[in-house]
UniProtKB/Swiss-Prot annotation:
Similarity annotation: Belongs to the protein kinase superfamily. Tyr protein kinase family. Ephrin receptor subfamily.
Organism ancestry: Eukaryota, Metazoa, Chordata, Craniata, Vertebrata
Primary location recorded for the protein, binned into one broad class: membrane
Designated name of the protein: Ephrin type-A receptor 6
EC number of this enzyme: 2.7.10.1
Domain Fibronectin type-III: 330-440, 441-536
A Pfam family per the record: Ephrin_lbd
Residues reported to bind ATP: 636-644, 662
Organism of derivation: Mus musculus (Mouse)
GO cellular component labels: plasma membrane
Amino acid sequence: MGGCEVREFLLQFGFFLPLLTAWTGDCSHVSNQVVLLDTTTVMGELGWKTYPLNGWDAITEMDEHNRPIHTYQVCNVMEPNQNNWLRTNWISRDAAQKIYVEMKFTLRDCNSIPWVLGTCKETFNLYYIESDESHGTKFKPSQYIKIDTIAADESFTQMDLGDRILKLNTEIREVGPIERKGFYLAFQDIGACIALVSVRVFYKKCPFTVRNLAMFPDTIPRVDSSSLVEVRGSCVKSAEERDTPKLYCGADGDWLVPLGRCICSTGYEEIEGSCHACRPGFYKAFAGNTKCSKCPPHSSTYVEATSVCHCEKGYFRAEKDPPSMACTRPPSAPRNVAFNINETALILEWSPPSDTGGRKDLTYSVICKKCGLDTTQCEDCGGGLRFIPRHTGLINNSVVVLDFVSHVNYTFEIEAMNGVSELSISPKPFTAITVTTDHDAPSLIGMMRKDWASQNSLALSWQAPAFSNGAILDYEIKYYEKEHEQLTYSSTRSKAPSVIVTGLKPATTYIFHIRVRTATGYSGYSQKFEFETGDETSDMAAEQGQILVIATAAVGGFTLLVILTLFFLITGRCQWYIKAKMKSEEKRRTHLQNGHLRFPGIKTYIDPDTYEDPSLAVHEFAKEIDPSRIRIERVIGAGEFGEVCSGRLKTPGKREIPVAIKTLKGGHMDRQRRDFLREASIMGQFDHPNIIRLEGVVTKRSFPAIGVEAFCPSFLRAGFLNGIQAPHPVTAGGSLPPRIPAGRPVMIVVEYMENGSLDSFLRKHDGHFTVIQLVGMLRGIASGMKYLSDMGYVHRDLAARNILVNSNLVCKVSDFGLSRVLEDDPEAAYTTTGGKIPIRWTAPEAIAYRKFSSASDAWSYGIVMWEVMSYGERPYWEMSNQDVILSIEEGYRLPAPMGCPPSLHQLMLHCWQKERNHRPKFTDIVSFLDKLIRNPSALHTLVEDILVMPESPGDVPEYPLFVTVGDWLDSIKMGQYKSNFMAAGFTTFDLISRMSIDDIRRIGVILIGHQRRIVSSIQTLRLHMMHIQEKGFHV
């Protein structure tokens, strides 16, 4: 077959060329390919070199769009030993390291050509050579490197010519690495009948892209296909790095493994991969990929890209208010001020202002002025009055005024303030009220003097008041140690203007106040009088004087014996009278401590909230620890108030013990400090093996910087360790480094619990314990709660997360941040006024009415039992809090966890009685669990013990009698599921009583409300069946 025949073939199939051209044109626009040569786009002659001249022929035809189609063909199949070469022009490699050659060609089947079996071939060879510049017409085939032998996937025959069928082959070969500036390609024909329709040379790149708001430039992949090129991106305009953005360029030009990202800066939001400025009236306060927000009420902005909206005139934003909070204004004045006065106290009450300014942090201050008859002439009251609880920063809308003076006009100005009052230049609004104290009350006493003093006693007298307005009934004397002012005081009474006070400390200064009581009431307390008791020396001198008198009297002779005898009898009688009087006064004397009566022999538990200064409660109930005895080792977590670290505590004369140190974070508010110290004050009153033990507190002294910077960096950030330059390491001998000047941290030091919180511990060791081991854990928790209940405390946040486990698997109750002390009434409950409640663990009455009691703790204990037996599963699983509340109201209770004995689940159900008086006491729970531990075989037989527990509701309520399962479903309005139950084989009540929530889902009950109703009814059915079986009946 000659060249003319091939040319004729191509011309016959010319109508395919436009289609071919269009297809190759699409490929040339692949985004990750850079084309170096494409013969289909060359408008002029190619000018490729052929060797020999009569080998390859160039054929150029025009397609229907008048674009040239360059083709090279050769078909010297009749002659043997063909060696025809076709070489391209010099091709610049650009930035490529590896190139790809795409060839489109047709090839004639040798079997379709007669008489050429020995000379016809069906392959050709592809070669290349690298060069830094063009060789011109020089061509040395021996210098070329072979790339591959190219064979056709399809070849055409004479029949294809007749049927006008074009069989076009496409082959791609890769070449590399290319190190010089350019290269040549060469095609060797060795006796084939072939037409080279097009040649395209390209290399691959990872194209420019934007990912996660980061731009990545064009990148050339490495020659080695197994390695990736790491590319760091740059953030788009108005964006900033959150994590370093990276992509990896693969060998095929694909971007892989995106890491990091950029986020839109403040004032900008992400829209379709770029950051756009917030429109006027909108803002974005923090960098991130969230949308701009509309300005909150009473604020606006009129420019773009705003990070915070500005408050309108008269409105303000406090320093700690988030930008999303509406601007607020100071409140109006309080309303409806009223007073109530008696002999000793003046009570001021008022209503909240009509306009709170849009804030909840409302406080009040009371300013006192003394006015004469002319109310325009007033002066400050000074420090004579006492305000309970205080006169500034009041949260409640009332205050008690003490120590006021009779016959005085007092004007009280009550100011209302909130968090932005200090930002306003306008005067604080107030409401004033004038109170004239009672003219009938007696005036104050005159001067007070010390008649004599001993080591333990003081004899005092004073001037009666100038105006008593009636007979003086008695005097009330209040006294306390000067160094312990307002911490502890005692009082006594005397009918005369004198008193002998006994039971005092030697060489101690006491403060005395006296007020008068008449039929018309009390006077105010007098000014302070200071007197000091004697020391041992003065008492010895007095005793020596008495001895001298006795000796002189004895020498006087027998004649004075009768007189002396009479003298001693009279003296003895007087002393007996004085002692009797002192004893009577001692009985009447009442010792007061922070407003609580102290009775001998009865331990009283004091609510820390009754202390105006929380540090006073801490120092009374908790031991102050010298911080040099503490060594901090590492951070183990974060609590509500700050970080929690582990460390060691050195006790004098004992070995070091591991401890946990709870810290108060920097920038805390007074309320946070008070709550933080309150927890320590509560823990310090507990002493039980199942209650977390308080080792002590650090509130006074400076703290050594040992390991703090390395392990508790927030100390340094919070400014607790001002002046510390660098922490000193502990020496090899274990000695502590020199002291470093430091600030005043606040810490609570408790025993260290190696296994952490119970819920995490159980999840980590799922299935590792026997049932008796789990019951032992539950018994420890119940024992700790019994101790708290006996003391009159309500925990309010009992959950597995608040139970800590030590290395011996002893469980201890912790986290007393929500605890409240109860009054003497054993059925008393604590009512909260706000705050978050852990819905899944809290009793219904506590959720609905905020009424907490030991019975609500029993409900929470039932949830803890369920957590323990399920190895730390989340109660009520993925149900929302609202669904939990509704489900409990409808009677739903948690089913028994897998493998949970019936007796334990029945105890849970008993704890979850809706009527709180029917729930078991912790005493009964401990007793029941003790039975199980002593007799493990009773785990499946002690259900009856639960049903007869004290405070049990008694017999199970009457349950309707159903003949069929269908009747039962109809009674709970679930009759539509009869066929589901029948088809699944649940045809008897015995089978139904064993159904779980998974069984109910499996038979096709999809709606959650229907699932809850059926499960609740099954639980009631199960309890009823168990009860009648215990009574000897059968279902």
